């Protein structure tokens, strides 16, 4: 299955994206989801195919959701992925001897 997809970003949550079939636009997205998502901001369009790889989503799940429910919601990564981890030697620099 090949799908031309429009991807929208949420103004409310960083790294939250809504995938929809371009031909349907936002018509199949439930009103409650749109209210929680905020006014969708178009990020880009993309041709999705089963052999294509996505950075943080399973392409097969995205295509399945687009076909069955008309949209796919990509949630932000867990908070701990936002934190930069410092090496132990830097964390111990101010420890008393």
From Swiss-Prot:
Signal peptide: none annotated. It comes from the Bacteria. InterPro entries: YcgL-like_sf, YcgL_dom. Gene3D superfamilies: YcgL domain (3.10.510.20). Residues 3-87 form the YcgL domain. PANTHER family: PROTEIN YCGL. This is YcgL domain-containing protein Avin_32960. It comes from Azotobacter vinelandii (strain DJ / ATCC BAA-1303).
């Amino acid at each position: 299955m090949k799908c031309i997809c429009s991807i929208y970003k949420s103004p409310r949550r960083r790294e939250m994206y809504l995938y929809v079939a371009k031909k349907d636009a936002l018509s199949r997205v439930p009103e409650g989801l749109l209210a929680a998502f905020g006014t969708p901001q178009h990020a880009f369009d993309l041709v999705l195919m089963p052999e294509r790889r996505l950075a943080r989503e399973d392409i097969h799940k995205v295509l399945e959701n687009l076909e069955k429910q008309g949209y796919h919601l990509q949630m932000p990564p867990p908070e701990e992925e936002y934190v930069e981890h410092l090496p132990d030697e830097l964390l111990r620099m101010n420890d008393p001897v």
